[in-house]
Amino acid sequence: MSLRDKAYSDLMRELWGSPDIWNTKKSYIEIAAKLGVDEETVRNRVKHLRDVGFLLGYRVVPNPTLLGRVFASLRIEFRDRESKQAAIPRLAQMDGVINIGSAYDTSLLVTVLADQDQDFPKLIVGLGVDGEVSLVPGLGLRTTSFRMTKLDWEIVRLLLRDAERKLNEIAKQLKVSTRTVKRRLNMMMKEGAIFTMPVVDLRKTEGISYQLRVQIEQGKKLEVEKSVVAKIGNVVFRASDSENGSVFGFTGANVAEGSDILEWVKQQPGVKSGSMTIAERVVQVFDWIESEVERRPKTMPVREPSPERKMQETIGIRR
């Protein structure tokens, strides 16, 4: 079965369909019930995604609010593909960058945990990157008021590159119980303090990975989204990038299919504009986020034990 089949697009949508469910833990039983199949079928399809090299794993990203930053997406247009490729390692050294998406043209889409008033064009020039920078409406990630503990940051640090590490291994390394690690992780997920993002190899999609952006007239969004999803059929990803903007990700068989869908979308009532990009690959970046998370526990003040705790310890010593 090809990854272009609706069975796989439906599965991927349930696993990681949009940023608002990145922090939602779903069991195979729940996914199976939603898709109308049995649990073993879901398990086998996920295994196939891994076996063909498409699903490489998952990474953890802390909510940018906890770092005093905001989620931002930059589109950088270059004069040619050569200058684009040369810019990727330089952009990977920029503070806040967590991944770099390359399209089959002369553009890059850079995901950044950015300072609130960041001057991106100036920052890019400072890196020696010659490209035209524009800010793409971000895919909304909810903020959080969760208060991270030192242990929380230590747990996150160990999951940044591999969100599927065994909890007992983490517990052993941090010298706490597995139950404690599980409890803290569940709490962080529930409060939106961390997000689990899929890591995929787009070259193994057995098709073309499209991203369709649509700007919609006021009050027509739900209607347009419904018709676009019905037209595409195998939507993997759907999200809002602004009040009247929507993004759809899907895998097509060829370039002609993508062109036909784009032309159809532009002609629909309520659609103001539409654009389509073909994703080539995604470069995962860890340097900045690892250093940022690693320093967090070191800068946290050591809390004095409460009077009650001191009394308990004193009594314990006397006994």
Task: Go through each PLM region and give its residues.
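A compositional/biophysical signature of low hydrophobicity enriched in polar/charged and small residues
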Residues: 1-319
